From Swiss-Prot:
Keywords: Activator, DNA-binding, Nucleus, Phosphoprotein, Stress response, Transcription, Transcription regulation. Disruption phenotype: Inviable vegetative cell population. Inviable spore. Belongs to the HSF family. DNA-binding transcription factor that specifically binds heat shock promoter elements (HSE) and activates transcription. Promotes thermotolerance by transiently regulating a subset of genes. Induces expression of STI, SSA1, SSA2, HSP78 and KAR2 during the heat response. It is found in: Nucleus. Pfam families: HSF_DNA-bind. Its main location: nucleus. InterPro entries: HSF_DNA-bd, WH-like_DNA-bd_sf, WH_DNA-bd_sf. The lineage of its organism: Eukaryota, Fungi, Dikarya, Basidiomycota, Agaricomycotina. Signal peptide: none annotated. Residues 11-23, 31-42, 189-199, 212-233, 497-511, 599-620 have a biased composition (Low complexity). Residues 280-333 are annotated as: Involved in trimerization. Phosphorylated at high temperature. This is Heat shock transcription factor.
Amino acid sequence: MTTNLYAIAGPSKPTTPTSTPSPRSEPPSPLKSLTSLPTNPLNPQGTSTSNALTNQSSSTGIGISKPGLSVDENGEVMKVPAFLNKLYTMVSDPEVDDLIYWGENGDSFFVPNAELFGRELLPRWFKHSNFSSFVRQLNMYGFHKVPHLQSGALKNETPIELWEFANPYFKRGQPQLLTKVTRKNNRLSNSGVGSSSSLGGSGAGGGMNTRSASAAAASGSGSGQIQQAISQGHEAGNHSTSGKYLITDGTTPGSAPPSHTSAGPLIAPQTLDLSAINSGIAAIRQTQASIATDLRKLQASNEALWRQAYETQEKQRKHEETIDLIVSFLERLFGTEGEGLKGLKEAMRRGVGVRRDRDGREGRDSRDARFADDDDGGQKKRRRVGLDRMIEGGSGDGTGEHGEIESPSSDDRLVEIGSNSEYSIPSVKRTSSSSHPLSLGQLGSSRFTALPSEDPSPSGSGLGSTPYEGLRTTQASAHGAGADVNVTDPTLGMNHLSPLSDTDPLLPSSSNALAPYTSHPSFPSSNPNPSSAWAFNPSQPLLSPTSAVAAAHAYNLDPSLLQTTIGSLLQSPAVAQMFLKSLSASAQGQALTSHSHPHNPSLLNPNPNGNASTSASASAHDMNTEGLGTGSGTKDLDPTLALFSPLPSHSSLASQSNDLLKSYNDALTVGEGVDNLQESIDSLVRSMGLDLPNGGSSSVGVDVGDGSGVGTGTGEGDGEFNVDEFLQGLAKEGEGEEGEREVGGDGDASSSGAGAENGRKEDVIAQSGLK
């Protein structure tokens, strides 16, 4: 008796392969390409079922298309749960890839938007739209969520989370593995009702309670034939390409009973994974906050460093400007490019950036090094005061503002020039020494260097605009020249003073000058009007920064020549003092003072045969009396008038330019003679076996040009040794023969004889003269 297969597992109602699944009905099998079973029953003439199945399989590629059932590798009929069947269909549908789709490897599937997936896709296949229920069903069938960090995991405002689920038997293109997906259940399995049973034995995943198995048990006579037919059908199916068949049966309720092994808690493993992820995210957020804090601190520190670097650069620039101003001022002050100024530049550059210690140790060291060879304390003080006032005095023209003194120490003060402070620096035009017959190479000593000339004042045609509007005029007669000339009496501009001199202020004025160089004018006969442009102005300082230049323009002289002459004398204060005193005691100076002040016995009748120191001290006393303003107008004569020898008038200056140049040449020759005379005295003293004292004294012989030499001795040395007294003592002894040494008419050679007898020495020195 043949058994019809439809009588065992046939559908309760015919199914159409082209039917569209309703949202709440069981979907068709994923293997839609498999052909259905033949509609005709088996051969009624007694043909075996195995032959029929074999022929059908070999001819048409037989497949079993019952939904919910499948045949495993052993040919056993296995039921696929409806949930897995629906899930496989949803994931494989390309129309809903925006809601659920396979992974790249096909081992898992993704749900990009859980909320949208539960609202739109779940109601089509299930009776609910709760995504949490869907996740619980996946957990029951052994699916697990794949944890991973998304790009926006560190931000709380991310509303969408990408869900990924995987199962080792749920893969793309392999629906036959769905039979190995088992369902977890907390209830103990029952071996009786609902136990697994199969036609040929228990399967790997447990048997299935099917109507075909119960029908086979009821009809025991046909069980062998059914088992043989299914086995043959399985063998025929091995020749097909797929090898697995799903038997669709919409009437099969429920799912297969679970195996004897009980599953653990369903949610616990997933909860542990989520807590680990949350803790990791919290740690990452904390680290991110710490990094952000450190980054803000680093940015603030970077800004502070840049600001400090900018401030340091600005301060360095101001210091450089200050150093340049100081060096340029000192260059104008000293008027030299020698080694002394270079050393001063280097010392200033090294000292600007160094902050002195509070105890002044570094300042003391620098002062000791600077004055190591200086034994005179008063000279130290004068040099220090000169440098301080040189810095405080501002620019060379006396109109600049004073810079700020930053250092609290009075010894080393740094000049800090702010952005608001302005320095009025006079422009300097250096004249070449080769433009005049008197070049620097013709000077007798290396210390006689040219001073820089300042900008010339306005033209001499406008006398009212020159700085000499308030200069006084005086009238004197030069008896040596034998002619009466009108001369002016301005005090020479001595802007370029040495800081080693005794002059206290750098820029003398009526309030701070060593002596107010003022006098009651004696108007010339040609212009007796006191209200003229050359009238006396007591408020006008005679020593101004541009006095030398103004005087040169007033007399149509070369400013470089006048400044060269005066600067050559003022480079060495001792030489300048000796020169002024020599001129004051000269014959022409006596004639000048006797003509201007006939009632002054100290100036009219100096004793040429007596001690020269008495005459010099008397002249100095008159000068001091004039500076203090206690004397009358007859005592206000400036000894520097002797520099203009012969003293020219403003009107006849053009015709007397040759005489003026000759006077300048004589002045330079005097300096050379002083040096030669000093060398002669030194050689004389050494020849006598005496040691030269530190202070040293000099004996100067001056010849004003007419051949009459006047010997003057200045005892300005220390108290231990006086050359004048020594020579007078030698004269009183009267031993030896008198000798006389003639002095050449050019005035460029003067010497003293060093005979065997000491009586000659005094006469040689007294009769030495210069032309």
